[in-house]
A protein has these predicted regions:
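Post-signal peptide N-terminal segment of mature Sec-exported envelope proteins
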Residues: 29-51
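A short beta-strand element within beta-rich, extracytoplasmic domains
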Residues: 62-79, 168
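Short, surface-exposed beta-strand/strand-loop-strand elements in extracellular ectodomains
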Residues: 79-98
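Sec-dependent bacterial lipoprotein signal peptides
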Residues: 1-21
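Cysteine-clustered segments with highest specificity for TGF-beta superfamily mature ligands
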Residues: 114-168
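Short, low-complexity, Pro/Ser/Thr/Gly-rich segments in the mature regions of secreted, periplasmic
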Residues: 165-177
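Bacterial lipoprotein signal-peptidase II cleavage site
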Residues: 22-29
């Protein structure tokens, strides 16, 4: 996720500067990237965030909304398939928000978190279209504007080991007004 955010932060800085000249949203293609996770298990009712926020340079112009869309291929060794999950994002430090410190990650009650996707069901090796920032595109924008963000997931069904998410053909739609 850090690769996505670093790449998108650079592109978004340019995009925000260009979009400031018009009121239309700007579409910015992002480089392909992968995220690997040792194991994913059922966390229904809880959102798991990485211990540290993704950090990057703030854009020169504040961003109002961001939506990321593209293809995701998920590969894993199933323990219980398929993986059904929803993605979340936050800009406030989970440690200061009453989340549980689980060593390598933060565990937060999903009821108090902000979803940035609908629910997705991933079969092993399947590729599908995903959108992050729908609903709540402003939380991604707030993270870009602050220069840090935590992106996590709630797994409502399934468990797997050796999970890899390959994000391809990703595009950021940016609005600055």
């Amino acid at each position: 996720m850090k690769t996505l955010l670093r790449t998108s932060a650079l592109l978004l800085a340019l995009a925000a500067a260009l979009a400031a000249c018009s009121k239309a949203p700007l579409t910015v293609p992002l480089e392909d990237f992968s995220i690997s996770v040792d194991a994913v298990g059922n966390t229904a009712g809880q959102v798991v965030y990485p211990k540290n926020a993704a950090q990057f340079d703030r854009p020169v112009v504040d961003v109002k909304t961001i939506r990321l869309s593209g293809q995701v291929t998920v590969s894993y060794t199933a323990v219980q398939a398929p993986l059904v999950m929803t993605f979340y994002a936050r800009t406030a430090d989970p440690g200061a928000a009453g989340c549980t410190d689980a060593g390598l990650a933060w565990i937060c009650d999903a009821a108090g978190e902000t979803p940035i996707s609908g629910e997705y069901s991933f079969a092993n090796g399947e590729t599908q279209q995903v959108t992050l920032g729908d609903p709540n595109p402003e939380v991604l924008a707030d993270g870009i504007n602050q220069g840090r963000i935590w992106i996590g997931a709630e797994v409502t069904s399934g468990a797997a080991t050796g999970v890899t998410f390959d994000f391809t053909q990703m595009v950021a739609e940016v609005t600055v007004f």
